[in-house]
Design a protein with these regions (language model features):
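Short, well-structured beta-strand segments enriched in hydrophobic/aromatic residues
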Residues: 554, 649-651, 688-706, 805, ...
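Glycine/proline-rich low-complexity spacer/linker segments in large multi-domain proteins
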Residues: 563-580, 703-738, 855-924
Length: 927
C-alpha cells in the first residue's frame, strides 16, 4: 500500500496540517533585525544583527492540495498520520494476507527546511520544531535556543553545537516517524518500506533527513529511490542502505527504480539498471510506476508507465521473470565483505562554509573497491555506536565482520568509533586512511587522541590503491581480463560451496573475463537468468573459468553442493561469426494497431468564435487560461492536412461528453458507446465519411473553468482539462521536413547505446506505403504505438550441415523483436545480444523472414517538444517549457515567449521522435 495522497508522505492529503499549527512543518529562519516577521513566524531570539524566528508553514501549496506539509518531528502528528492511513489499511487487509506479506510504502518523507514565506528575505533556513528543541535539551543538557547563532556563524564551539544539532535532528526524525510507524507495522505483521527524500549525497542526507542509516535500521525492509536512466557515480545510496541491512540482518532490500526514465526505456535498459542494483545487494524491485489511467495529466506523470497501456505489455512477463530470478540470486547465502568504509556523514555536519564536501572523495573509494572486486560495507557512526565490537582482529558490526577498515576524507570522528578502531588495530586489524585524517573528536579538538589514530593508520592515496589494490586488500575473488574493472562481482558465503554474482556494467559492449576459482572447486556451473539456462564451465589448468558477459549481463557461478544434481548443458562457445549476406530493403510492413496522427496544436477563441489565435500548443493554451483564471466559453480549432482520404479514420479524444459541440468540417458529431484508444478515457468516434482532401478542421466548444490548484476539492483542483486529440485509422503520416538528430540528451551519456532522433516540422495524412526501408518512424508511422510486422524474402543456397547460421538484428530499434523464419518462430529478442540462431529454419531457395516488432508509448505520448529530443530523465514539465525537475531552467511564460519567436530553454515547436524498426540491414552470419 502507498501511504499518501501524493508525496511527500506524512500530511495525509492535508488532514494532518488541518489539525492545527502544532502539526504543521516548521523551520528556523535568520532575518535582519529590521525585517518584518511574516505571518506564521514566532521570534525565538535576537542578537546584535539578526533575529531568529520559528516559522510555521502556511496553507497554500498545490503539492499539498492547498494545505502545507506536516511537522514530522512531532510524534503526535505522526501518530495521527498512522491513525488516518496505516490503521484503516491494516484493519481491513491484515487478516487477508500472510505475515510479512503486507507492505506499506512511504515516499520521500523529510524534515527539510523548505517551506517558508516567499516574500520574506532571510539568511538561511534550517530544520526546526519545538520537539527538536526538547530533544536537543534531553540529549545534551543545554538549550539549543541559546546557541542558534552558532548554527549560522563559525564562533565559539560552533562545530560541537552543529554536531549536536544534526545528531538530534536525525535521531528525533527516526524516533518520531520511522520507528513509530515500524512499531505499528509490527503489531499487524506488516512491513514498512519505501524511501526518504535526498539520499543521493551526504549534504542532502544531512539537510533533508538527518541520517538515512537510522531509517534503514528501523524499517522492516529498507529502501531507496533510483531515478533516471543512469548508474554512473551513484554507488553511495544503494551501498549505504544495503550495508545497514547487512549489519542488522535484514534480508530484503527495496529500490523504487526506473522512475522518470521515459516511456521509451526498453527491456535492455531495465536489465542494466536492475543488475546494477542486484550486484550491490538490492533484491526487491518496485517499478515506478503503473498508471491506473492515462486521463489528463497522468500521461505526463513522471513516465514510464508499466501497465497494459504499453504496446509491449504482453511480453513484460519476460522482464519480470528475469527480475525475479536475479532478486532471488541476490538473497542466496550471506554477503561476506572484506572491508568497511567509515561514513564521513558527521564531518558534513560540522564543516564550515569554506570547507569542501565529503561525498565525492568517499565515492571514489567505493568505486575503487567495487571496480577491483573487493566486497565492502559502509559504516555509519551511530550504527557503530549501537552495534559494533572488536573480535580478535575483526571489526564487527552486528551480523558483519571486517578484516580491513578504511577512513575516507574526514573532519571529525566519534570517540566511540575511535576507541573501537584503536582496539581493532591493536588486535592486528588493518586500518587505512585514504584522505585527510580527522581533526576533531566529537567535534572538539583532541590532539593527543588524534595523534594516536595517526600512528595506527596506514595512510594511502586513492591513486596508490588503484595502482596495486591486491597489495593492500586481497579481492574476494580474482577476475582478470582487459575490462575486468567493468565486471562487478559479489561473493556470497555458503557452506561447502562457492557462489558468485557477476554483472557487466556496460550497457554497450559484451565483456570477456576469467574468474579464478578457489583451489579444489568442484563442478563449476554458470547460471544465465536471461536465457534462462544453466551451463557447465570448463576449468583451465590454473583454476580459471572464462566467461563472456552480454551487455548489462547478470550471471552467477556456483560450485560444490550448489551445483550438485543440476542438469547443466555444455557451455556454448561463442563462434567466430562472419557476415555471409544481408537482407536488403524494401520491407513490407503490417501494423497490428491503428496508425495515429497526434494533434497537439490548436487555434482558440474566447469570444464566441469571432476571432481565433494562431495555432498554439494545447498544453500552452491550458496554462495561459489557468494563469489568467479565465472562466467562460472556449473554442478550439484543430486542423489536419489530408492528401488522400483514408478508408477508415476515427477521432480519439478525452471527455467528449464535457464538450458542448464537436464538429468535423462544420458537421456536428456525437460520441457513443465504449470504444476507446489506448486508455478507456480516450474515446473514439468513426469520422471516415466526414473527411476531405486538403485542410480538415475539428472544432470543439467547451465551458472552460480554470483550476484552483490550492483547493482541497480534487474536482476544483483540476477542473477543465485540455488535452491532445488524435486521428487514428488506416493511413500513413508523413512530413515534407525531417532531419536526423544525433545531439540528443540520451547521446550525451557515455553509458548508453547511441541512436538518432528525428525532427519533424509538420505532418499530413496520405496512403500507407506498400514497402519501405524498415524504419517505421520515417515511413508513415512517426506517432505509432503498437506492433509492426516487417516481412521480406531472400534467396539462400543449400545450407552447409557443418555450419551454423545466425541473424544479426543489432540495427533494429524495438522494445521486443519476434523472429519468424519460414513461418516458424526462431526466438523473441528482448535484450542484447540481438542475434538469433536460425540454422534449423533455413532452407535452400526462397526463405521468408518476418520480424514482429513492438515499441512503446514514447512516440505517441512524447515528450515531443523538448530540445533534448530523446531524454533520459522525464517529468511533467518536460512536456512544457516551464522548466523544473528534472529539466532545470525554463520560462514560466514559455507559451507567450514562443509566440515572439524567443529561443526558449526547453520548448520547441519541432516534433522529436525516436526510431522504430530497422536503422540498417539485417545480416546473416555464419561460423
Amino acid at each position: 500500500f502507498y501511504d499518501e495522497d501524493k508525496w511527500p508522505s506524512g500530511f495525509a492529503g492535508g488532514l494532518i496540517p488541518g489539525l492545527g499549527e502544532d502539526f504543521r512543518a516548521k523551520c528556523l529562519a535568520r532575518l535582519d533585525l529590521q525585517t518584518a516577521i511574516p505571518e506564521g513566524g514566532r521570534l525565538l531570539k535576537k542578537d546584535s544583527l539578526y533575529q531568529y524566528i520559528q516559522y510555521t508553514a502556511q496553507y497554500g501549496y498545490d503539492i499539498f492540495n492547498g494545505a502545507c506539509y506536516a511537522d514530522l518531528f512531532n510524534p503526535n502528528a505522526v501518530r495521527k498520520f498512522i491513525e488516518s492511513t496505516h490503521q484503516p489499511y491494516f484493519e481491513k487487509y491484515s487478516h487477508k494476507v500472510a505475515d510479512n506479506a503486507l507492505f506499506i510504502f512511504t515516499d520521500e518523507p523529510h524534515i527539510h527546511a523548505r517551506y517558508f514565506d516567499a516574500r520574506t528575505k532571510h539568511h538561511g533556513l534550517l530544520s526546526y520544531s519545538p520537539y527538536l528543541e526538547e530533544k536537543f535539551q534531553e540529549l545534551y543538557g543545554y538549550s539549543l535556543r541559546d546557541h542558534l547563532g552558532q548554527l549560522y556563524e563559525e564562533k565559539g564551539n560552533w562545530r560541537e553545537v552543529r554536531w549536536h544539532y544534526y545528531l538530534a535532528k536525525a535521531l528525533l526524525f527516526e524516533e518520531s516517524y520511522t520507528r513509530q510507524i515500524a512499531d505499528f507495522c509490527d503489531q499487524y505483521g506488516a512491513q514498512l518500506t519505501g524511501h526518504y527524500l535526498g539520499e543521493d549525497d551526504l549534504k542532502k542526507v544531512r539537510d533533508r533527513i538527518g541520517n538515512s542509516a537510522l531509517h534503514y535500521r528501523s524499517m522492516q525492509q529498507p529502501g531507496i529511490d533510483h531515478l533516471g536512466l543512469s548508474i554512473a557515480h551513484r554507488l553511495f545510496t544503494p551501498k549505504y542502505m544495503t550495508s545497514v541491512a547487512d549489519q542488522y540482518d535484514k534480508p530484503r532490500r527495496l529500490s523504487e527504480l526506473f522512475g522518470i526514465s521515459g516511456q521509451n526505456v526498453n527491456f535492455q535498459e531495465r536489465k542494466w539498471v536492475a543488475g546494477w542494483h542486484a550486484i550491490l545487494g538490492v533484491n526487491h524491485f518496485c517499478p515506478h510506476l503503473t498508471a491506473y489511467s492515462l486521463k489528463g495529466a497522468r500521461k505526463r506523470d513522471y513516465p514510464p508507465t508499466f501497465s497494459y497501456h504499453q504496446p509491449y505489455w504482453t511480453y513484460n512477463k519476460r522482464m519480470e521473470d528475469y527480475l525475479g530470478r536475479i532478486s532471488y540470486a541476490a538473497t542466496v547465502g550471506h554477503f561476506d565483505p572484506q572491508a568497511l568504509v567509515v561514513s564521513p556523514l558527521e564531518s558534513e555536519y560540522v564543516k564550515g562554509d569554506r570547507e569542501g564536501e565529503f561525498t565525492s572523495g568517499m565515492v571514489q573509494i567505493l568505486e575503487a573497491l567495487q571496480n577491483n572486486h573487493i566486497d565492502f560495507n559502509l559504516g555509519d557512526e551511530e550504527v557503530i555506536l549501537e552495534k559494533a565490537a572488536v573480535a580478535d582482529s575483526q571489526f564487527v558490526i552486528g551480523a558483519m565482520r571486517y578484516r580491513y577498515v578504511i577512513l575516507p576524507d574526514m573532519l571529525t570522528i566519534r570517540q566511540s568509533t575511535l576507541s573501537l578502531l584503536l582496539r581493532f588495530h591493536k588486535n592486528g586489524g588493518v586500518l587505512y586512511s585514504m584522505g585527510r585524517l580527522p581533526q576533531y573528536i566529537d567535534a572538539k579538538s583532541d590532539p593527543a587522541a588524534l595523534n594516536e589514530l595517526k600512528q595506527a593508520v596506514i595512510s594511502l592515496r586513492i591513486a596508490e590503491f588503484k595502482a596495486a589494490p591486491e597489495k593492500y586488500i586481497p579481492p574476494g575473488v580474482r577476475i582478470t581480463g582487459p575490462h575486468a574493472d567493468e565486471v562487478w562481482v559479489q561473493r556470497r558465503k555458503i557452506k561447502e560451496a562457492s557462489f558468485y554474482l557477476l554483472y557487466n556494467t556496460s550497457d554497450i559492449a559484451p565483456l570477456s573475463v576469467t574468474l579464478q576459482l578457489p583451489a579444489g572447486s568442484q563442478n563449476p556451473v554458470l547460471w544465465d537468468p536471461a536465457k534462462p539456462g544453466v551451463f557447465q564451465l570448463p576449468v583451465d589448468k590454473n583454476g580459471g573459468v572464462d566467461i563472456t558477459l552480454a551487455p548489462a549481463g547478470f550471471y552467477w557461478v556456483t560450485t560444490g553442493k550448489l551445483s550438485e544434481g543440476i542438469p547443466a548443458k555444455p557451455l556454448p562457445q561463442p563462434p567466430g561469426l562472419k557476415p555471409l549476406m544481408t537482407i536488403d530493403a524494401p520491407w513490407q510492413g503490417k501494423r497490428n494497431a491503428p496508425n495515429t496522427l497526434v494533434l497537439d496544436f490548436a487555434e482558440y477563441s474566447t469570444d464566441g468564435g469571432r476571432t481565433y489565435s494562431a495555432p498554439e500548443p494545447v498544453i500552452g493554451i491550458w496554462s495561459r487560461l489557468n494563469d489568467a483564471q479565465y472562466n467562460g466559453d472556449l473554442r478550439l480549432r484543430f486542423s489536419a492536412t489530408i492528401r488522400q482520404v483514408p478508408g477508415h479514420c476515427a477521432l480519439a479524444m478525452e471527455q467528449p461528453g464535457a464538450f458542448r459541440q464537436i464538429s468535423i468540417n462544420h458537421t456536428p458529431v456525437r460520441f457513443s458507446g465504449d470504444r476507446y484508444y489506448i486508455d478507456p478515457s480516450i474515446k473514439t468516434r468513426d469520422i471516415s465519411g466526414l473527411l476531405r482532401e486538403g485542410r480538415n478542421e475539428i472544432e470543439l466548444q467547451i465551458p472552460f473553468t480554470a483550476c484552483d490548484p490550492l483547493n482541497s476539492d480534487p474536482v476544483k483542483r483540476y477542473e477543465t482539462e485540455l488535452e491532445t486529440i488524435y486521428l487514428t485509422g488506416d493511413f500513413g503520416v508523413f512530413s515534407d521536413q525531417v532531419q536526423t538528430i544525433e545531439n540528443t540528451q540520451r547521446n550525451l551519456s557515455e553509458d548508453l547505446v547511441k541512436r538518432p532522433a528525428y525532427a519533424f516540422e509538420s505532418f499530413f495524412i496520405n496512403r500507407e506505403k506498400d514497402r519501405f526501408d524498415g524504419n517505421a518512424t520515417l515511413s508513415g508511422y512517426p506517432f505509432y504505438a503498437g506492433g509492426m510486422a516487417l516481412s521480406n524474402s531472400f534467396e539462400f543456397p543449400s545450407p552447409d550441415s557443418g555450419k551454423r547460421y545466425f541473424l544479426d538484428l543489432s540495427a533494429c530499434e524495438a522494445t521486443v523483436i519476434e523472429v519468424i523464419v519460414n513461418d516458424q518462430r526462431a526466438d523473441t529478442l528482448c535484450w542484447a545480444p540481438y542475434v538469433v540462431d536460425i540454422t534449423k529454419y533455413l532452407k535452400k531457395g526462397t526463405n521468408r523472414l518476418q520480424l514482429n516488432l513492438v515499441n512503446s508509448l514514447r512516440n505517441l505520448l512524447g515528450p515531443h517538444h523538448h530540445k533534448g529530443a530523446e531524454l533520459i530523465k522525464v517529468g511533467p514539465d518536460s512536456f512544457t517549457g516551464a522548466g523544473g525537475f528534472p529539466d532545470g531552467r525554463g520560462e514560466p511564460d514559455w507559451y507567450d515567449l514562443r509566440k515572439k519567436k524567443t529561443d526558449l530553454a526547453i520548448w520547441t515547436d519541432t516534433y522529436y521522435q525516436v526510431p522504430f524498426g530497422l536503422l540498417g540491414k539485417a545480416v546473416i552470419l555464419s561460423d
